[in-house]
Amino acid sequence: MTLTDAATSLHEQLVHEHSAHNYHPLPVVVAQGSGAWVTDVEGRHYLDCLAGYSALNFGHRHPDLVAAAHRQLERVTLTSRAFGNDQLGPFCAELAVLTGKQRVLPMNTGAEAVESGLKVARKWGYEVKGVPADRARIVVSAGGFHGRTISIVGFSTDPDARGGFGPFTPGFDVVPYGDLGALAAAIGPDTVAVLLEPVQGEAGVIVPPAGYLAGVRALCDDARVLFVADEVQSGLGRTGQVLATRGAGVDADVYLLGKALGGGIVPLSAVVADTDVLGVLRPGQHGSTFGGNPLACAVGRAVLELLADTGPHGMLAAGRRRGAVLQERLGRLVGHGVVAVRGVGLWAGVDVDPRLGSGRAVSEALARRGVLVKDTHGATIRFSPPLVVTEDEVAFAVDALEQVLDELR
């Protein structure tokens, strides 16, 4: 069957007429995906350098993950937590080992993991630290992105995410990201946690100053405050490490994981911490019908197996090698249509010279050349290809960006 642009128009019309208008996607309608590539309904091929905002760290339809899903689909997919299932225990144990923690609270989406982590932190504050009832406070960072639930957008500094959704949940203090002095000033006797991303993804891949995460750890230790690291985007290989926080030589008290944990196949997230933190939860105080379901846990176990390979041919090592190529190649463009490049591992934020056009315009031009990226905050675009991308494919993406910039100059 020969596909034409009419197929794209039809799909876009259906979405426009029947879906809420809460996204502004690029004019590409994907029909298939394999590895680092996708094919649209017209039959055109694209190198996926967004990877589902890092949900597809292992590429589209990784054979090990698809096989795990198929095996579980033939057995049982959902039990709820009213009963046990034979995938939940092994998944929690294996994730605890990989992260160096003792306990796991399985959920579904990244925002659920964040909300669950906030609840746990407050409860820990009341029951363990001894904060008076209803006075717990949590410090967060300006520019951070942790999801779009009502509590989370309440402490967002993004006017689009926040506007029109008040009144908001109280108990949050916002400080500049990377500013240890401001963080120290914000921590008081009722502070129970500091929540931050070790690398701010949605903000444009903002890497904190050297020593910042270690400084956060020290402040939390001094004040008996939980360090909660939102690794929903940064974790599970994106920075070349299992955990970006650990890559900086720091251990958080609580890790929030999601996106790639489900292999790009099923939603799966988790709160990971030691017993002295997650032990504050008792039956009936928190739950999720789908959290810890056998299908998600089976896929999650296959993801953990991929990450457990720390050898030179494993996913983490491959991501570091490809990431070094990406950072070096993008760095050459600074001063040639690019104002700045920030990044770590296989993850980069590129600030395009705003005189050449918006990040959206550059993203659309790249799509026409067969490369998918996404813009954020004006003239910034993000690169986060799957860890299975090759060096030649990385070069293809950066060459395409260079060609687009040349055309715009």
Predicted regions and their residues:
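Conserved N-terminal phosphate-binding loop of PLP-dependent enzymes in the Aspartate aminotransferase
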Residues: 2-409
